[in-house]
Regions:
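Residue-level detector of alpha-helix boundary/anchor positions
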Residues: 5-7, 32, 128
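Carbohydrate-active catalytic/glycan-binding domains of CAZyme proteins
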Residues: 46-504
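Juxtamembrane/membrane-water interface recognition
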Residues: 11-14, 42, 206
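Intrinsically disordered, low-complexity regions enriched for glutamine and histidine
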Residues: 10-12, 21, 31, 172, ...
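N-terminal secretory signal peptides that target proteins for export/translocation
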Residues: 1-26
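Bacterial N-terminal signal peptides
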Residues: 28-41
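N-terminal non-cleavable signal-anchor helices
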Residues: 6, 41-43
Length: 504
């Protein structure tokens, strides 16, 4: 375990109010038999360690860490729906590319920064810069004339950076200690990686003369952000991986390995730990060109990664004059930031029917997940690279809808590990067919149904809801169980369960 990364249990463990209260019934034994004190305390501590504290935080099923047992259900990766073009090449400075976008909500607007290319990749002179766009709804975008950077004799453009380095990855720094004139930060890649700061996200300057990362290669969209869960800055950059079994469609040609993702952390954004490769267990070694890693705000226990998977052994569409290979988008998740769950090896986004996506480097997930309606998350993907039709297209998916626990017509069930929660009600994000259903049972740590919360006490639940409270015959109040070790049993038929949480 990386010493700079909190463990799963350390993130979730809920402290009891009093060790004495927890072991009051054992006090006489401990006084009469002091030799047993270590045994009793060790047993109690081990039991407490086995309980996962979820508090009132939303829990997903992107990994199996909460699951004790399943019967006739499976975890399923879902796929976003292709929508309209969000950004495309319109201006002279965008002629040969719009790509590597970062977007987030900032107050009452959505903001985006993206790379533009004024000359064709591989041709000279080549000029890669950073442009800016904004939106009121996260769907329709405008490119304001900012008057900051001169291009071909005019500042009538939306450019915000043309200095050293390209592939800017900005973020709003929510570190309480951040200086007002450094409220926005970014990293850019020249040959090495440099840090930038800004008071407003538009006017940028170098944070330091020297680069923050020099352990090349970095030719990718390297990402950095302030992580409120870890209370430190985190970066995910390009790396090279040489271990493990080579995945389907891959070949070792990049310095004897494949392109991979590395991670580092910092307390001050200037001084960073050594870059460390992410770990994916025994999953096959695949080439990850970009990473688009983000802390999922609706369920902040989870980091999600959407790397562009580069199948370098595949031939592109006939007549393609540039490089070999094709891309799709993969899906990974992590709770500690270094160990990523790789259960789902199939693509999250395929190239699809658009033939402009069937060549190398032509499908990159951009960094950012925007909630554009109560029932919709928007994601963005660069497509048609090196073509006049190069674009950043919007995709949508239901909130928390990346992975579900799914039961077929014949039904099945899931039992969680022991959990400890806070709150008064249990909320589910679910979808059933017209004949599908859910029932929910709450058990004690040992698997015994609790009075009033047994399966027989829960009327059938059906429909399609993002955040609906579970009701039993006696009502929906579960506050009497808060702070105790409980298990949740979900019995379901022709249904998907995306997430659950406890709350008021």
């Amino acid at each position: 375990m990386n010493p700079g990364v909190p463990s799963f249990n350390s993130i979730h463990r809920q402290e009891e109010s009093s060790m004495f209260a927890r072991h009051r019934s054992s006090l006489f034994i401990l006084l009469a038999h002091p030799a047993l004190i270590l045994f009793v305390n060790a047993s109690a501590s081990a039991a407490d360690e086995s309980v996962i504290g979820v508090g009132h935080r939303r829990q997903l099923f992107v990994d199996g860490s909460l699951i004790e047992r399943t019967d006739d259900v499976r975890r399923v990766l879902h796929h976003p729906t292709r929508r309209e073009i969000a950004l495309q090449s319109e201006h002279r400075w965008e002629k040969y590319g719009v790509s590597y976008m970062v977007t987030f909500r900032d107050g009452d607007r959505f903001r985006a920064w993206y790379r533009v290319d004024a000359a064709l990749l591989g041709k000279t002179p080549r000029r890669a810069m950073t442009a800016y766009a904004e939106s009121d709804d996260g769907i329709h975008w405008r490119k304001p004339k900012l008057g900051i950077i001169e291009f071909e004799g005019s500042k009538e453009n939306n450019l915000v950076w043309d200095g050293r380095g390209a592939n800017m990855a900005p973020f709003r720094d929510d570190n309480p200690q951040a200086k007002p004139d450094e409220r926005y930060k970014a990293i850019v890649r020249a040959r090495d990686v440099y840090a930038l700061v800004s008071p407003d996200g538009l006017h940028w300057k170098s944070a330091e003369k020297n680069p923050i990362f020099t352990d090349r290669p970095f030719d990718s969209h390297n990402i950095a952000f302030w992580d409120p869960q870890e209370k430190q800055y985190v970066a995910y950059t390009r790396g090279v991986r040489r271990d493990g079994k080579l995945g389907r469609g891959m070949q070792s040609r990049f310095k004897g390995g494949v392109r991979w993702v590395r991670r580092a952390t910092s307390k001050d954004f200037r001084n960073w730990t050594t870059l460390e490769p992410i770990r994916t267990g025994d999953a096959p070694r695949e080439e990850f060109y970009t990473n688009a890693t983000i802390r999922y705000q609706r369920a902040p226990d989870y980091l999600l990664m959407f790397p562009s998977r580069f199948a370098t052994a595949r031939e592109p569409k006939p007549g393609w004059e540039f490089g070999k290979g094709v891309n799709d988008i993969a899906f990974l998740s992590s709770r500690d930031g270094i160990h990523f769950d790789r259960t789902f090896l199939e693509a999250f986004i395929r190239p699809g029917l658009d033939q402009g996506n069937w060549h190398e480097r032509s499908l990159y997930m951009e960094r950012g997940i925007l909630q554009t309606s109560p029932t919709e998350l928007s994601l963005f993907c660069m497509q048609n690279w090196r073509l006049p039709t190069v674009q950043i297209r919007r995709y949508t998916i239901r909130p928390d809808g990346f992975v579900s626990v799914q039961a077929g017509y014949r039904g099945g069930e899931l039992l969680t590990k022991p959990l400890r929660f806070s709150g008064r009600r249990l909320f589910l994000n679910y979808s059933t067919s017209a004949i599908g259903s859910f029932q929910v049972e709450i058990q004690d740590r040992d698997g015994k149904p609790l009075a009033g919360f047994a399966l027989a006490d829960c009327p059938e639940i059906y429909g399609d809801r993002i955040d609906a409270a579970v009701r039993w015959n006696a009502g929906d109040d579960v506050s009497s169980l808060a702070g105790k070790a409980v298990r949740i049993r979900f019995v379901m038929s022709d249904a998907d369960l995306f997430a659950f949480r406890f709350g008021q």
